[in-house]
Regions:
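A detector for small-residue-rich transmembrane helices and their helix-helix packing motifs
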Residues: 1-188
């Protein structure tokens, strides 16, 4: 097996430097995209669950370079520099890049499995509610699966059981379409 023997320890090795640049450019691009199009780039590039209508295969890669905010980007890039530099200096650029990509894809796989498990449990609870729709079951469902902010205002308009059924279907779609950003395991 070929071993990489660096001639010296580099503080900012090639792959780490390029990953820092790519992540920074994607973050700046997402800010520009948001200002220009008044839409969030993570709607396209964040990882969606495989049954989501918004899922695209390229998201398995692009989610690794998306970050929710500056502190998310900073903490991930600081960790990448701190730990990635050591690993790249020991392993070499090729092995480190392979490791980074495998960890990112592994994070995507773990996210898909965990999301699938959670959605299956939600599906069982929602189907139970739909087969026994009443106010008490609706409240139990909301306690177990609280609606995210974007649906919380719609909850105020639920006045009868038919609206509650419609709301639960919306809630399931929101959970199914929630995206993952920020390496999902590539650094940690």
């Amino acid at each position: 097996m070929d071993q990489f023997r660096p001639s010296r320890f580099e503080v900012l090795p090639l792959v780490v430097k390029n990953l820092l640049i790519i992540n920074g450019l994607v973050f700046l691009g997402s800010l520009a995209y948001e200002n220009f199009y008044h839409s969030d780039l993570s709607d396209l590039l964040a990882l969606r669950y495989i049954t989501s209508p918004d899922f695209k295969p390229y998201q398995l890669i692009t989610h690794m370079f998306m970050h929710a905010n500056f502190m998310h980007l900073f903490s991930n890039m600081f960790s990448l520099w701190m730990f990635g530099s050591v690993l790249e200096n020991v392993w070499g650029p090729k092995r480190f890049l392979i490791f980074y990509m495998i960890c990112g894809l592994g994070g995507a796989l773990c996210h898909m499995v965990a999301t699938g498990f959670e959605l299956h449990q939600m599906d069982v609870a929602f189907k139970f509610f739909l087969s026994h729709p009443d106010q008490e079951q609706f409240m139990v469902l909301l306690k177990k699966y609280p609606p995210p902010y974007e649906l919380s205002t719609a909850l105020n308009g639920v006045t009868n059981i038919h609206e509650a059924i419609h709301f639960t279907m919306q809630l399931y779609r929101v959970y199914e379409n929630t995206g993952a950003v920020g390496a999902s395991g590539a650094v940690f």
